[in-house]
């Protein structure tokens, strides 16, 4: 524990340190922590292996003390040299009865106490008796006297983050509104261009009509060609007819000669 304390000090003077974390440094008793740490407000000794609090220093400004997951069964009177204590975590220890907790009555500002996973919590009317013993207590094992759960620091962070996210969502909505306004403006411009499109359609119709007049000239030319073809056909028919008439005359003359010969 002494080496760990020196490491955590980081060359600072003992009376300048306000927070000290000695978690998991194995020791059955407190060694190396002295009365010099007069400015210390938060001390953590989680899972150290402590069996006793004998030798606990006088820490006049200590407000938060973490002693969970040790093997402490008694000796809470050694803590009374830190009268400003407000938060005490003794969960996961060997405290078996409420009598062992009597020294805590000296702490007039103790607001939070955690005794979870101690045999003392199995005593009849345990919570009611503890709240009666310690009038300043607000939360016992994470709940108040009305069994309302204490709000953790993590919940506060979530609420802050939640508000931020709502603001972000609101910002997104504003951007969407801006986009819709832009689209409305585009729609107005669309109405102006519609008249232009209408005028273009009229021009196209006029050009088609002019092309239709030109097409009429083509039809007249086609009609003239058809008339010429008809006249050619009539001339050909007359020529054929004139050829056939001499043939008939020759046949008539031949028949007349034959009759004379027969006579």
Swiss-Prot record:
Residues 144-189, 198-232 have a biased composition (Acidic residues). One of its GO terms (cellular component) is endoplasmic reticulum. LRR repeats lie at residues 16-37, 39-60, 61-83, 84-105. Coiled coil: none annotated. One of its GO terms (molecular function) is histone binding. Its main location: nucleus. Residues 118-156 form the LRRCT domain. It comes from the Eukaryota. Residues 242-254 have a biased composition (Basic and acidic residues). Residues 144-263 are annotated as: Disordered. Keywords: Cytoplasm, Leucine-rich repeat, Nucleus, Phosphoprotein, Repeat. SUPFAM superfamilies: L domain-like (SSF52058). GO terms for biological process: nucleocytoplasmic transport. Pfam families: LRR_9. It is found in: Nucleus; Cytoplasm. Transmembrane segments: none annotated. Phosphorylated on serine residues. Belongs to the ANP32 family. Implicated in a number of cellular processes, including proliferation, differentiation, caspase-dependent and caspase-independent apoptosis, suppression of transformation (tumor suppressor), inhibition of protein phosphatase 2A, regulation of mRNA trafficking and stability, and inhibition of acetyltransferases as part of the INHAT (inhibitor of histone acetyltransferases) complex. This is Acidic leucine-rich nuclear phosphoprotein 32 family member A.
